[in-house]
Amino acid sequence: MSKQPSLSYKDAGVDIDAGEALVERIKSVAKRTARPEVMGGLGGFGALCEIPAGYKQPVLVSGTDGVGTKLRLALNLNKHDSIGIDLVAMCVNDLVVCGAEPLFFLDYYATGKLNVDTAAQVVTGIGAGCELSGCSLVGGETAEMPGMYEGEDYDLAGFCVGVVEKAEIIDGSKVAAGDALLALPSSGPHSNGYSLIRKIIEVSGADIESIQLDGKPLTDLLMAPTRIYVKPLLKLIKDTGAVKAMAHITGGGLLDNIPRVLPKGAQAVVDVASWQRPAVFDWLQEKGNVDEHEMHRVLNCGVGMVICVAQDQVENALKVLREAGEQPWVIGQIATAAEGAAQVELKNLKAH
């Protein structure tokens, strides 16, 4: 008989019991998000979902994303209750820009050592995001990988599938000179630019936990969950049929994201003085001495979603969005691009 001790998975740093305890805690979260098309609950090898009734030529739309280094800030602040909302938002906002209704969502949670309480907070946030977007949390993977992550540090990825009627796909092909650009406000930096944000905090030496802006703790402003625009935008599409293009303003800001939905020869002319930039962006710019152009190339600067409609549809679109609880702005229009011109022109940039 060997004198070597009998090794278990737990000795190697993987706690199967903790994983099972987490699954039990999050079953109710998944149940709250259930859509009628979803067949069965958590625990199967694969999640089954029917195409919703009423579609003539349904097209499935998929997307995947993470939350970037906002996660590092969440870990540093030990704030895990809303990062799951960010994860869902980053995926579903990308789907809705082509007119798709999100159907189901899966998450991937990888960690060095599973903290069941932390993971349950994260997944509860994912469930809240799914409820806000009307999509079903159908499964996920929790991977405990000792030696791959430091301690209880974790990483997140989300995967979402939606559906859109083939004849109603929004792809920007009908965008024309003279069209108007509307915008929906962001809640803050959302889930992009956090490597710059963290560098600004580091270089400035700011104690972000003691600073207040406009009466709100700076940590709350930096960690505010990414807004989920799905329900108001689906209502806008359904009630008006006027949406020609939409751009989710993520990494790359207005400068890199609007061109993704513009046809060749079109230029977006955006007046940056047409909306009130939240104080958190001014604080970041000042503390990091960040160039104004760089601000708009990295951060959303207060705009989370841009919508293109014909000029004669502006008032109707604004009305529908306001009725849905949004506070939209008209921020610019589409022009014919001059030879060699950038696809986005920002007017009234602050001198810095």
UniProtKB/Swiss-Prot annotation:
Catalyzed chemical reaction(s): 2-formamido-N(1)-(5-O-phospho-beta-D-ribosyl)acetamidine + ATP = 5-amino-1-(5-phospho-beta-D-ribosyl)imidazole + ADP + phosphate + H(+)
Pathway this chain belongs to: Purine metabolism; IMP biosynthesis via de novo pathway; 5-amino-1-(5-phospho-D-ribosyl)imidazole from N(2)-formyl-N(1)-(5-phospho-D-ribosyl)glycinamide: step 2/2
UniProt superkingdom: Bacteria
Gene3D superfamilies on file: PurM-like C-terminal domain, PurM-like, N-terminal domain
Keywords, ordered alphabetically: ATP-binding, Cytoplasm, Ligase, Nucleotide-binding, Purine biosynthesis
One example GO MF annotation: ATP binding
Record keyword ATP-binding present: yes
GO CC, alphabetical: cytosol
UniProt-listed Enzyme Commission number(s): 6.3.3.1
GO biological process entries: 'de novo' IMP biosynthetic process; adenine biosynthetic process
Family annotation (CDD domains): PurM
Protein location: Cytoplasm
InterPro entries, per the entry: PurM-like_C_dom, PurM-like_C_sf, PurM-like_N, PurM-like_N_sf, PurM_cligase
One Pfam family cited in the UniProt record for this chain: AIRS
Keyword Cytoplasm: yes
UniProt family annotation: Belongs to the AIR synthase family.
NCBIfam families: purM
HAMAP family: AIRS (MF_00741)
Protein name: Phosphoribosylformylglycinamidine cyclo-ligase
Source organism (scientific name): Pseudomonas fluorescens (strain ATCC BAA-477 / NRRL B-23932 / Pf-5)
